[in-house]
């Protein structure tokens, strides 16, 4: 495989926050260096179900992760497995649930917090965090600076064809403070600046890049339901290909086949939604 793509998941960022607070991302759109669409998540718009849908291309009622209490190995074809089947190298810098969904479960911290498994059929290079002890007061989230540096290190050291970064910082901020507040303004600005620091380097390394979220949140910081604020996110695309009209509403289930299409990996029959990039 000679193509490369990175998926950056900023957990819990609603569409409105992307478009009003991420000035660096929006500046790239204005300059023509990126494109942006609105994307709607599956329901329930909870983290676990959305993670599984992002990588399998099917709704929770099919893949079986119906809530954040259903953490198990998903038994359907997924992005990691398809990239590996096509000869690509995969990496993940994410919450530990991604490892449980797509490599092995249950997550054993000493064994699974960090691994390099060149022969794995799914994730070759994993760097994970559990957020154990998380509550309303203590977010237990790792520094985004460390996550971004770690993904870049994996790209340089192992030549990833597909890599994913997932950060829960803004999701946790939203649960604690809501969205109409100075804390959220500042948090979005910091992550936007982090993207500005790393994204040009990824592009220079030959990566196409997707920046998006798994789900949104209500103004009070809730998600899981059906409201547009809880489901709708922005998707920014840094790469080639023909995309849909700017006003098109993307389906989250089309993300997995789109990633595979860009990488030249086979799209399994279980992924029934057409790629939105040609």
Task: Put a short name on every predicted segment.
Residues 1-278:
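Feature captures the catalytic ectodomains and active-site-proximal regions of enzymes
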């Amino acid at each position: 495989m000679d193509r490369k793509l990175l998926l950056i998941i900023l957990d819990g960022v609603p569409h409105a926050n992307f478009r009003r607070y991420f000035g660096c991302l929006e500046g790239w759109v204005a300059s023509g260096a990126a494109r942006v669409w609105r994307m709607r998540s599956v329901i329930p718009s909870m983290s676990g179900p959305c993670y599984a849908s992002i990588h399998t291309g099917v709704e929770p009622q099919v893949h079986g992760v119906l809530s954040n209490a259903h953490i198990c190995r998903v038994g359907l074809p997924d992005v990691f497995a398809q990239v590996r089947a096509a000869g690509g190298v995969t990496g993940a810098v994410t919450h530990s649930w991604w490892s449980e969904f797509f490599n092995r479960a249950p997550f054993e911290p000493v064994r699974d917090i960090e691994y390099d498994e060149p022969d794995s059929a799914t994730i070759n290079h994993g760097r994970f965090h559990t957020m154990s002890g998380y509550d309303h007061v203590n977010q237990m989230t790792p520094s985004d600076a460390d996550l971004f540096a770690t993904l870049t290190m994996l790209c340089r050291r192992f030549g990833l064809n597909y890599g994913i970064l997932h950060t829960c910082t803004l999701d946790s901020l939203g649960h604690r403070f809501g969205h109409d507040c100075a804390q959220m303004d500042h948090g979005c600005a910091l992550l936007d600046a982090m993207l500005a620091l790393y994204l040009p380097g990824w592009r220079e390394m030959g990566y196409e890049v997707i920046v998006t979220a798994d789900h949104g949140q209500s103004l009070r910081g809730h998600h899981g339901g059906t409201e547009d604020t809880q489901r709708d996110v922005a998707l920014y695309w840094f790469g080639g290909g023909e995309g849909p009209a700017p006003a098109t509403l993307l389906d989250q289930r089309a993300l997995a086949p789109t990633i595979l299409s860009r990488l030249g990996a086979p799209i399994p029959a279980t992924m029934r939604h057409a790629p939105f990039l040609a």
